[in-house]
């Protein structure tokens, strides 16, 4: 059967990558405000304070804070049914420890949600998308402290209660499974171990990281329970960065490597959030890595009861794994792996694999039997603004066409229960991995360079009209 008639077509962004206004409306600094600009080859720097000579792109980003009415009008012109966005925690609780929320922060999002409603667009709200209040990073080393669970629950309860009737869909933590990687220390968990500066090569303490991830999983379950209590109409989902892998060869040892890699990155957090308990393989992983988690009986009961209502995911690429140390490697700037000889790569070295999306959706469906929504998918590429204001991006249209076609096959031929699709970076924004504006994903071009200079004027790319037609025909015309 085709996509359901109320399928949620739209786009996605994150507050720290699009909003700007980092010191306006009572907002406090977040962890993202201390990330410098980088490039494909130069890692971003994590600084304890503002340092001369460095650019901090998330502070201005795409200036959605001052352009939201225009931006939402453009989404409406494309026919968006949904807009997946995040609320900046430090705009609601500037340090994370206030007992009362910042009224100006709540008002800003009230205005955004009212504008979305005026254009018939459903908000899908991520409560935490790599933007922990900086104060909590400095005082508690982020999620390493159990104290942060209660602070996050207060924030989540405030948001869900205040926006009752305006927001029906929430995601707890963006790409929570990035906490299974050393890369996730700062970005996902707010951990800044001593000596950490290079964003891509952080000082790692696996014990601290997995304890912090446990605290985050408990907070996610607390949020689900609070959401159901405060707003019975609300649906609370998880958000997993799906990074499928294939065994490079039919060597049984490659198959075992594939199995272990897949479940530890893709399933470890999802099993807890969807099934309510740690999976059987977690204990052996902890023992092999000298991890001794503090898990209380109350934690176990919270996890058991606080399972999510739906499964959301990001999907960009796949990799291969092998036990062969001499295998050629993919050149991805964020997560690498063995090079797949059957796949092409993006300008940033990410291996493009539409069929992998179909495979992934089927794996999720068969494992969890929950409604699924894709909340991130897209192609980061360099775009050229022509003298006449046009931007020709056939490469983006091609990428999205192929992924939507694979998504359709998963629904129509395989029976996957998919209820929405929001492309990543529908409006150009700051790249999380590199801090660049040059790595553009949007249907809407923002006139801003990597140093934050430009008019911030918005221009429609060729893909703008193409996606409008896709939505208008409910995915029939690609």
Please report, for each region that a protein language model flagged, where it lies by residue.
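Glycine-rich, proline-tolerant flexible connector loops at the mouths of alpha/beta enzymes
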Residues: 87-101
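Catalytic domains of carbohydrate-active enzymes, especially glycoside hydrolases
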Residues: 63, 67-88, 305-310
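Active-site mouth loops of central-metabolism enzymes
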Residues: 53-66, 144-146
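Short, flexible active-site loop motifs that bind/organize anionic cofactors or intermediates
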Residues: 58, 65, 96-99, 347
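Active-site region of glycoside hydrolase catalytic domains
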Residues: 1-46, 51-52, 76, 95-97, ...
């Amino acid at each position: 059967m085709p996509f359901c008639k109320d399928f949620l077509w739209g786009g996605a962004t994150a507050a720290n990558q699009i909003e700007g206004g980092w010191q306006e409306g009572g907002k406090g600094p977040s962890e993202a405000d201390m990330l410098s600009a980088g490039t494909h080859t130069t890692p971003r720097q994590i600084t304890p304070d503002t340092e001369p000579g460095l650019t901090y792109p998330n502070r201005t980003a795409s200036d959605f804070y001052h352009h939201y009415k225009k931006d939402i009008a453009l989404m409406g012109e494309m026919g968006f049914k949904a807009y997946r966005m995040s609320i900046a925690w430090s705009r609601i609780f500037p340090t994370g420890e206030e007992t009362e929320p910042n009224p100006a922060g709540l008002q800003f999002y009230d205005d955004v949600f009212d504008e979305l409603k005026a254009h018939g667009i459903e908000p899908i709200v991520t409560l935490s998308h790599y933007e922990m209040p900086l104060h909590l990073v400095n005082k508690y080393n982020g999620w390493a402290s159990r104290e942060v669970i209660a602070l996050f629950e207060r924030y989540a309860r405030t948001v869900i209660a205040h926006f009752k009737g305006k927001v029906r869909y929430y995601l707890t933590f963006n790409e929570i499974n990035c906490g299974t990687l050393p890369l996730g220390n700062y970005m996902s968990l707010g951990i800044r171990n001593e000596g950490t500066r290079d964003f891509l090569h952080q000082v790692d303490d696996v014990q601290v990281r997995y304890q912090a991830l446990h605290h985050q999983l408990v907070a996610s379950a607390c949020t689900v329970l609070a959401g159901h209590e405060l707003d019975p109409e609300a649906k609370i989902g998880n958000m997993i960065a799906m990074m499928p892998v294939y065994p490079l060869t039919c060597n049984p040892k490659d198959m075992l490597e594939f199995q272990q890699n897949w479940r530890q990155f893709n399933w470890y957090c999802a099993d807890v959030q969807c099934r309510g308990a740690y999976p059987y393989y977690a204990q052996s992983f902890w023992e092999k890595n000298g991890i001794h988690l503090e898990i209380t009986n109350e934690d176990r009961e919270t996890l058991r009861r606080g399972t999510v209502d739906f499964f959301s995911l990001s999907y960009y690429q796949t990799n291969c794994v092998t036990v062969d140390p001499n295998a050629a490697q993919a050149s991805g700037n964020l997560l690498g792996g063995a090079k797949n000889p059957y796949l092409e790569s993006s300008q940033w070295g990410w291996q493009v694999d539409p069929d992998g999306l179909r495979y992934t959706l089927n794996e999720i469906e068969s494992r969890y039997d929950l409604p699924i929504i894709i909340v991130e998918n897209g192609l980061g590429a360099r775009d050229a603004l022509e003298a006449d204001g046009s931007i020709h991006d056939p490469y983006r249209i091609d990428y999205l066409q192929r992924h939507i076609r694979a998504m359709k096959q998963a629904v129509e031929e395989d029976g996957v229960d998919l209820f929405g699709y929001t492309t990543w970076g529908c409006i150009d924004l700051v790249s999380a991995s590199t801090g660049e504006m040059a790595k553009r994903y949007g249907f809407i071009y923002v006139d801003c360079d990597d140093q934050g200079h430009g008019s911030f004027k918005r221009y429609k790319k060729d893909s703008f009209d193409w996606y409008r037609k896709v939505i208008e025909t409910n995915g029939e015309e690609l």
